[in-house]
Amino acid sequence: MQVYDISQELFGSVVFPGNPVPAHRALKRMEDGQAANLSEISLCTHNGTHVDAPRHFVSDGRTIDRMDLNRLVGPCSVIAFEGLLTASDAARLISGRQQRILWKGDMAFGVDAAREFVRAGVLLVGVESQTVGTDDCRADVHRTCAAPVNLGGLEGAPCRAVLIRP
């Protein structure tokens, strides 16, 4: 089994305009005579690699702590695509694939493509503007784990996303 980390490093990740920049500071340092190192972080729930809960765009949607983790862990397909994904592109590319789709490349999709994902029973759509996976990780079917931090009542949370080649 090989595990590939597909997460962005949080403090070096691109920040959406207007969102706070993630930061950290040392509270305790062993080099200063403390018994342990201890840090404090501040971040937006949508900085870096993260999971959006339905609450992010639906006022009464489920919060991150109420999401079914089974949707975020399991077999997935990695599909390379560049540009704007249309509904017909989505239907063609996801046909016969796993229910979890990770898109590799600089891509975006609109409402019609999102509706096609729902119609096809897609459980997870992963997008990263830089890449999903690494150059040596080109096999089409993997397993993925993108479990979010359990932040009760919030609309999103950071996660450590990985691809697993059995």
Regions found by a protein language model. Name each.
Residues 1-166:
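Active-/binding-site microenvironments in catalytic and ligand-binding cores
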